[in-house]
Amino acid sequence: MSIVLRLLSVLKHQQNKMQPELSVSNYRLLDYSMEWSSSSVAALPTSSEKTVMMPAKATSSRKRHRKPKLQYAKRRFSPVNPNDLVLVRQEPTHCVRLVFPLSKRWIHFDGLVYSLARLNVSMTVDYHVTLALIHAPEAGECFGNLLHLTPLLKDCLLEFKKLCILGKTLTILASEWPFFTGVKKNKDNLTFPKAVEWLKEHGYEIYHSQLPLHMSLAKLHDLPQAQFTEAVGLCHYFDPREFALPCALEVVKIGGGKVNGRSIPLVRFPINNEFKFIPYLYQCA
């Protein structure tokens, strides 16, 4: 029994003696592996050499030459949405219009004149019908060819009826009278569309205001809201009706000068009407 105990003590003593040596060898092995791995990443430079860094991972050896001017050349953008497009509309610079004789007496506007006077509103003295609004910022004297448009506008009798408010302007709607009673018939009522088409064919840039054919009667922009509402009510109270033959075709600059309330025309071409207006023609409707 004593021999067995002695052998066990000897084995335990030898085992305890071997463990420190094993731990030391493991430490040396670990330290050697760390030293080897670090040497694969960077080589220690000598006094006569520059530091050379080696990549830890394999990458492409192709060099990318970046040019500042081309840094956005290959960028991909999302497709254009039609709703993102904004159409820039050119503002009109000139007005092609039809004017009437100064001797024309607008007798059916008398009641309207008196009613507007109570609101401190004056009727216009520059009666005209706008044929077209055009964009011509560098027009110069290029309106001379409009002389050839006047034969198309000859004997174009206009009827005015139905008051309405466009924006804050009191207007009356206009339309072409389709025939003269007992004098001329079979008018196609397309004089104005044909005239606008003529302007397009001759290079004029037309501005489409989307407004009906009308004649302005009075400006209501400066009225307070209460008086403006009262002026709007006049459209339902009065129902004037007038006829008139245009006597000339004019071109005026929008925002240009005026004399006695009338716009100064850049050019003016008379319209030689064959038909002489018969008073009270509206009774023969």
UniProtKB/Swiss-Prot annotation:
Xref: CDD domains: ORF4b_HKU4-CoV
Domain of life from the UniProt record: Viruses
Name of the featured protein: Non-structural protein 3c
Species name: Bat coronavirus 133/2005
Lineage: Viruses, Riboviria, Orthornavirae, Pisuviricota, Pisoniviricetes
